[in-house]
Amino acid sequence: MAAALSRKRRLEELTVDEFLASGFDSESESEPEGAPEAETQAVRAAAREPDGPGGSPLASRRKGGASEHKDQLSRLKDKDPEFYKFLQENDQSLLNFSDSDSSEDEEEQLHSLPNMLEEASEEEEEEDGVPRGPEGKRRDSVPVTLAMVEKWKQAAKQHLTPKLFHEVVQAFRAAVATTQGDEEGAETSKFQVTDSAVFNALVTFCIRDLFGCLQKLLFGKAPKDSSRVLQPSSSPLWAKLRLDVKAYLSSVIQLVACVAEATVAAAILQHVGSSVPYYLTFPKQCRMLLKRMVVLWSTGEETLRVLAFVVLIKVCRHKKDVFLSPVLKQMYITYVRNCKFTSPSTLPLINFMQRTLTELLALDTGVAYQHAFLYIRQLAIHLRNAMTTRRKETYQSVYNWQFVHCLYLWCRALSTICPSEALQPLIYPLSQVVIGCIKLVPTARFYPLRMHCVRALTLLSESTGTFIPVLPFILEIFQQVDFNRRPGRISSRPINFAVILKLSKVNLQEKAYRDGLVEQLYDLTLEYLHSQAHSIAFPELVLPAVLQLKSFLRECKVANYCRQVRQLLEKVQENAEHIRSVRQKVSFGVSDQRAVDAWEKRTREEGTPLTKYYSQWRKLRDREIQLEISGKERLEDLNFPEVKRRKVGDRKDEDRAEFKDLFDLESDDEDDAPDFTKRGMPGSPGAWQKVEEEDDDSSSSSGEEEVSKSEDGSPDTEAGLDPQELWQLAQGPEDELQDLQLSEED
């Protein structure tokens, strides 16, 4: 009793924190004094019984714990009302306690196993990424063999099943993981590919045969209309195959990024092109595919560029509203990035990007207008800044390859898509930007850039039927350049105006500059006048050009330049006379626009002298341009002498032949000089040639000159000496000819 009072007294002296840390009841309250030990043992024995009269011992223990906790809180309310009030204000969850809450909490803490364990499905295992065995442990990877691949191939051709397709996809993913160095992915896969022969066989099987079997499994027979695209999601088996197809498509994209061999990459891209309907089902994989195709379209080998573009246009044609606009934006940015530098080797690739990008823009003129308006406006802003500030940095932002190629791209796009009501309003602002680019720095050093702009305007004017005053920018060069001035230096290499924008001061003094300039002026004038050759106003249009060309012929004294310009003038005057004679027979006036258009259309179909000449000239010129791009045509025409250095063995053979002929000539004197055939003459032509070649191997012409002099009977030839003098010469120093070997026949 005294011990109980002391414990109770200590309880009253406890603080709130100490009270919460200790139990709520004293030992006397939880267990009455004098409780027999046998009763305690009986309680423990009852707890061990699996079933009691009132239910399971676990449930009774939960219920007893909840009621006991309630009693403790009620006693706390009587003993310490202040602390109980504190709990009411700060911890209501402790006071609002029920038997059900206690049972639920304890059930969460004590987990009970179900009667039947649920097995994971193949799809859940696929998303988990880690194949596991029946006990939840990671199972060992199965090595793929050639026999397994052949077995899969034969089974797929006979009848492809979802389970077989799942296994093949797992093996294909393991093979692709090895190409990326993904060791963890290869280890966690169900299969493992370690042999290169197995890798090649597996990839070949998947690319060539697997999707054909899958198509047969999903749709049965092929559709009668081959142009109609079947949606894989319309098949009843799609739900079972969806995740495996998704994993396979992702692996194919990874494989395209890893393959370096062009032929293998081309085969994979052909497979990707045939599987575009499957990519369209998965937007994420489709975006990944488009991003990779844009990279190949701009940087890949020529065949890969074409195949990548085929994939791009297939996707954009079927999903215009989703993918066309972002793909156009990405392709334009990539195009600008890749045309920063231009050379004869990169120019065909830039032209390919221009044409293919134009083809994508033609899919939807509404989307094309949005992009064209935005980027033409951007070019105009750069030009305006350069015209207002007049600093070197600002005009360099315009006079560069990226700006010029962008101008040419939009001129080509508007020309190709024409006629289009949506893009028609952009012709005028684009032509003004090009003309402003020409007028920004109109000096001789930027004539190549002017010619690029003139070509773009000519293309735009001819294709859209819009009159653009291009001829003044060509004729202005005839007035500014003095073609009679003697060149300051002569260059053996011609200037390729197709791959330059600016000429150096040294180039302006070269003869090759004026030769190329006259040739370019001839081409540009003929191209522009050909586009206007059917016009009813052609005689009046070419009048300034005729006057300028006649003035050039009067002033120029260079025959080659005059011959080209005179030929151009004759063709222009012939075409003007033809148009003048034909239009005299018409009865309508120039104010009748419909009649004028009909007459011009009929004239174009019938042809004019200038158009007939242009068609023949164009064929020859295209061939010449291709040769100039390769950089070989002009150097072949110059016929430079080649310095060929003979080998030591060749020299000895030729020396033997020369000495043999020489000794045949002196055969009459053999009796007087018996030892002559065994020693060479120091003054012989072969000996002089040998010495000169040893002194200077790079000068082959000098040796040939000595030989020619000897053959003509020059003073160096010793053939006219008498035998005694020849004998004295033969006794000369032997070290000069010790390397020569005479033929044993002599």
Swiss-Prot record:
SUPFAM superfamilies: ARM repeat (SSF48371). GO terms for biological process: apoptotic process; negative regulation of transcription by RNA polymerase II; ribosomal large subunit biogenesis. Its main location: nucleus. It comes from the Eukaryota. It is found in: Nucleus, Nucleoplasm; Nucleus, Nucleolus. Residues 26-36, 119-128, 664-674, 733-746 have a biased composition (Acidic residues). The keyword Metal-binding does not apply. Residues 19-82, 117-141, 662-746 are annotated as: Disordered. One of its GO terms (cellular component) is nucleolus. The modification Phosphoserine is found at S56, S93, S667, S743. GO terms for molecular function: histone binding; transcription corepressor activity. Keywords: Apoptosis, Nucleus, Phosphoprotein, Repressor, Transcription, Transcription regulation. Residues 65-82 have a biased composition (Basic and acidic residues). PANTHER family: NUCLEOLAR COMPLEX 2 AND RAD4-RELATED, NUCLEOLAR COMPLEX PROTEIN 2 HOMOLOG. Acts as an inhibitor of histone acetyltransferase activity; prevents acetylation of all core histones by the EP300/p300 histone acetyltransferase at p53/TP53-regulated target promoters in a histone deacetylases (HDAC)-independent manner. Acts as a transcription corepressor of p53/TP53- and TP63-mediated transactivation of the p21/CDKN1A promoter. Involved in the regulation of p53/TP53-dependent apoptosis. Belongs to the NOC2 family. Interacts with p53/TP53. Interacts (via the N- and C-terminus domains) with AURKB (via the middle kinase domain). Interacts with TP63 (via activation domain). Interacts with histone H3 (via N-terminus and non-acetylated form preferentially). Associates with core histones and nucleosomes. This is Nucleolar complex protein 2 homolog. The gene is NOC2L.
